[in-house]
Amino acid sequence: MAVVFQKPKALTDVPLHYCPGCPHGIIHRLVAEAIDELGIEGKTIGVAPVGCAVMAYDYFACDMIEAAHGRAPATATGIKRCRPDNIVFTYQGDGDLASIGMAETVHAAARNENITIIFVNNAIYGMTGGQMAPTSLPGQVTQTSPYGRDVKHCGWPIKVCEMLSTLEGPEYITRVAVNNVKNVKNAKKAIKKAFQNQIEGKGFSLVEVVSACPTNWGMTPQKALEWVESDMLPYYPIGVYKDRSAAKEEK
């Protein structure tokens, strides 16, 4: 009998703690499948964030380290520079990467550190109960913006891919989503490419994954996916924002 689907070897047997309908499980699987297919499980080191994915070290069957809040890119930089033959990735949410960790993210990209960053953007602080994040949309209701995000007082959401793509340093900056089958497949390709770039020594790769948070958005999983399509993706368009290798090939 042909096997059409199975759990990736790069995932452990530990049950995921995420809320019902949370896409973190899908994204974990895509990362693990990329690790499996590239044959790098034995030399991969992951860096877990502070946030909903804080226990990622329980789920990935590779060496993992826990970073201080927002400091995953700096931690990954240290690991990669000390152990350049290892494949190093971070897995971070918007409350970690785009707020307290913004400096580490920007400067790792500017230096073109040869690391891979998986950035999950669900426009809210999930672990702490649904506060406004740097990526929360204008007018979005959260625990700390009960009348909706007012850009006059709170500023505009930060578009990480657009910002990082203006830097000279990074190799690959892309935004994907996991709200339907087509987007999941494309997300897998992007994540695998980000790891492949590191294997080839090309430098900094960041894959932003537009995700959902049904619990803190106050929606059913189905409604949350619909909201990703109707509200999140118009503000955070999927696509490749920088790919230096592709640009060179076109020339």
Task: Provide a role label for each language-model segment.
Residues 102-107, 127-141:
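Active-site-proximal loop->helix
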Residues 133-200:
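Conserved thiamine diphosphate
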Residues 1-4, 8, 13-14, 199-251:
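Flexible, low-complexity linker and terminal segments
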Residues 50-52, 122-124, 180, 208-216:
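Glycine-rich beta-alpha junction loops
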Residues 1-126, 189, 193, 200:
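Thiamine diphosphate
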Residues 43-46, 86-89, 114-118, 162, ...:
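Structural motif
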Residues 62-65, 108, 133-137, 223-226:
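Short, hinge-like loop/turn segments at secondary-structure boundaries
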